């Protein structure tokens, strides 16, 4: 069991570390939030009773992932059952790769298109819309649980953008590709349509954290 020095954290930090239910940490920079999360991860790792259990730490950036993992290792805790990364990486590694066969769109295989190739396709599709001054930068989308939504604030462009993005998604589907935003969308779709997958993840005792600066 991971044990820390008595004076290394305060009572509130200790309560957060020992809490078995969900914890929301709100703290200003320099208040010890990172230390608390690091100790929490180390504590949960030391409590695992099976090699089928994992502690999952989800961060906003890869840099934060590296920092947290390094801090946990410096505490002398075995990190072989720690997975840490961004939400997109988590969805790829734990949902899409092992369970993509449950998705009608992905069941025949897929690859993730990089941002350069995505921009190249969208730039080409925008060319017929020069009079409307539509460019690649207008083609931003936000994936939500039910669909994709345009981020362009100029609503006059929305109809044309819907057409452009319709063509874009058709090209990706034809080539068995998905882009960055679709990683989250299809991961959620699998979890929603196949409760057995969500149940499997739950039974692995996955514990997740959102960490920012």
Q: Each predicted region: which residue ranges?
A:
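Accessory N-terminal region flanking or inserted into the helicase ATPase core
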Residues: 1-26, 31, 35-36, 54-56, ...
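Short helix-terminating capping/connector loops at secondary-structure junctions
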Residues: 49-53, 78-80, 200-202
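Catalytic P-loop NTPase motifs of RecA-like helicase/translocase cores
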Residues: 44, 90-91, 208-213
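Short, well-ordered alpha-helical packing segments
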Residues: 41-42, 69-73, 88, 184, ...
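Walker A/P-loop NTP-binding motif
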Residues: 35-50, 67, 71
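Alpha-helix C-cap/termination motif
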Residues: 19, 47-48, 75
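Conserved P-loop NTPase-based nucleic-acid remodeling module centered on helicase motor cores
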Residues: 54, 66-139
């Amino acid at each position: 069991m991971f044990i820390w020095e008595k004076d290394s954290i305060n009572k509130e930090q200790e309560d957060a570390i020992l809490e078995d239910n969900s914890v929301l940490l709100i703290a200003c920079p320099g208040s010890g939030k990172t230390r608390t999360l690091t100790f929490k991860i180390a504590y949960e790792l030391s409590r695992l009773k099976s090699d089928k259990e994992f502690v999952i730490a989800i961060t906003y950036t890869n840099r934060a992932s590296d920092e947290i993992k390094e801090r946990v290792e410096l505490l002398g805790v075995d990190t072989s059952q720690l997975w840490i990364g961004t939400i997109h990486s988590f969805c790829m590694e734990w949902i899409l790769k092992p369970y993509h066969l449950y998705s009608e769109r992905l069941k025949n295989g897929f690859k993730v298109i990089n941002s350069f190739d995505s921009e190249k396709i969208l730039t080409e599709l925008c060319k017929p819309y020069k009079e409307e001054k539509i460019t690649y930068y207008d083609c931003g989308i936000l994936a939500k649980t039910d669909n994709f939504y345009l981020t362009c604030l100029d609503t006059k462009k929305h109809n044309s953008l819907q057409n452009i993005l319709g063509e874009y998604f058709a090209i990706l589907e034809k080539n068995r590709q998905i882009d960055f935003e679709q990683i989250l969308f299809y991961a959620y779709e699998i979890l929603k349509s196949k409760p057995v997958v969500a149940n499997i993840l739950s039974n692995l005792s996955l514990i997740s954290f959102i960490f920012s600066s």
